[in-house]
Amino acid sequence: PELQFDTCASGGRRLDYITLSYAWPLCQSDCMCYRDHDREATQTENFCLHDWVPLHAGFTWLEPPDDYEFYSSSGNGISVKIWSFEGQHLPEDEETYNWDLAREQLNNQRKIRDIQLNGNIQPLTKHPEERENWCAHACVELSGNRGYILAFRRPGCATAEMTFKLDGVDATAAYELQGLEGFSEVVSGKTLASGFQVVIPQDRGVQLIFFKRR
């Protein structure tokens, strides 16, 4: 009774519905086991697993504290692999490491988790397996009170902005938006529902926007 255990997933091969009724993957695949892992592949994993695996997590090396790297591994949770691997100690210089950014990233991940547990995840882009495409999804709480948009512009992607339509927001309400790099705006629910533009100026870029009803 009340036994809890993690399934390491064996490269993702144990993410079957029977096993997942008893456990959840703190590390959803072996893709992230290496410091130079394929971030775009991890984004695609998360994008697709949201439809099938209610609780799942990737993990991040937090080296350097890079928003693109961190949020690429963001599922319902995230595991932090920051100490040591194959004899390498991380972070290599604890005095100069940006701990404040790491704390901000982990706090944002908690917000993502809480919204997902009370909301519906919405794919915003198609064919994330094709590297020239953005990879983006949103989640809106069932109450319509808050949600987030998480969007990646991949390396070599020529498109700097995309327009997304969100389901589940209140078209009659106003929403406060807060994002990375100091992004802040107030928009109507009608704008979020009919088409909200997200801009990511640089390729290999990410934007995470939280919104809440005023």
Predicted feature residues:
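Short beta-strand-to-coil "C-cap" segments at the C-terminal boundary of structured domains/repeats
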Residues: F210-R214
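Solvent-exposed serine/threonine-rich low-complexity stretches and specific carbohydrate-binding patches
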Residues: V186-K190
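Active-site-proximal substrate-binding groove within the catalytic cores of carbohydrate-active enzymes
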Residues: L3-E185, V199-Q202, V206-Q207
